[in-house]
């Protein structure tokens, strides 16, 4: 949504093999990633720095009808890179936000 909207924007209808890409981040000592999701999905998000690159972590996602935080350990090399989240599993979910920890 627009700046100041009361309702937050999010990515909806994420299904099997959907990939979301975000550019660019200065990765320094990133050891975990936290995401906030909801929906009727069971699986995980692969975390990569390239569309078809190495998987640096997997963030679990389960069925829930309210926004839920999930955290996973990641092993992302230091440096400036993009982030790609690819959903692997069944059903569909929405992604509200993510945080590098």
Range-by-range predicted roles:
Residues 1-101:
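Extracytoplasmic
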């Amino acid at each position: 949504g627009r700046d100041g909207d009361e309702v937050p924007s999010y990515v909806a209808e994420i299904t099997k093999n959907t990939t979301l890409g975000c550019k660019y981040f200065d990765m320094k000592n990133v050891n975990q990633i936290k995401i906030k999701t909801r929906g009727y999905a069971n699986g995980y998000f692969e975390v990569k720095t390239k569309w078809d690159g190495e998987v640096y972590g997997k963030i679990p996602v389960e069925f829930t009808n309210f926004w839920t935080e999930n955290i996973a350990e990641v092993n992302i090399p230091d440096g400036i890179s993009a982030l790609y989240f690819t959903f692997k599993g069944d059903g569909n979910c929405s992604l509200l936000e993510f945080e590098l920890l």
